[in-house]
Design a protein with these regions (language model features):
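N-terminal amphipathic/basic-hydrophobic helices that include classical n-h-c signal peptides
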Residues: 1-10
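Long, low-complexity or tandemly repetitive, helically biased scaffold regions used
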Residues: 9-156
Length: 156
């Protein structure tokens, strides 16, 4: 299933002072990437875990495929761990956006809003790293094509 290329999503740091709309756009894209990982990674892990114990025998071929699937299973588990670590940062970002939405823009609140936007930027920066890592590990796990496991080494 195609996923957006995270390399195309610019990451801002605290020195760029992005605007409210830029941060919301970046957050929305990041949230979508996290949702895709949450939808795709556990089923991939399950498919790998279903095939792995079916590899039978002590042949070089069986050992090679077993090792490949163990690596893919580990990559899928690390992917899940990474996107789950990003969840608290995304939830906090949600709360900040809610605060910004509930509070009308007034001149006397400019410093407060700017501090919230800076905090939102920092949260996004941290979560981007975790989601990037999760996607990289997901790609590694997905690269292990289960269809390439020869039927001759699988138990029914």
């Amino acid at each position: 299933m195609p996923r957006p290329n995270h390399a195309l999503i610019s990451t801002m740091d605290s020195t760029t002072q992005p605007g409210d709309a830029d941060l919301r756009d970046e957050y929305a894209a990041l949230r979508e990437r996290a949702i895709l990982l949450e939808e795709q990674t556990p089923p991939l892990l399950q498919r790998i875990s279903d095939v792995l114990p079916r590899i039978s025998g002590e042949s070089e071929l069986a050992d090679e495929h077993r090792e490949r699937l163990v690596g893919a299973r580990n990559a899928a588990m690390v992917s899940i761990e990474n996107y789950q670590q990003a969840i608290p940062f995304l939830q906090t970002a949600d709360s900040i956006i809610e605060q910004l939405d509930k509070t009308p823009e007034r001149d006397e609140d400019i410093e407060w809003r700017e501090s919230l936007l800076q905090r939102l930027d920092e949260l996004i920066d941290v979560a981007v790293v975790m989601i990037n890592d999760a996607e990289d590990y997901f790609d590694q796990a997905q690269a292990c094509d289960l269809a390439n496991v020869p039927k001759s080494i699988l138990e029914d």
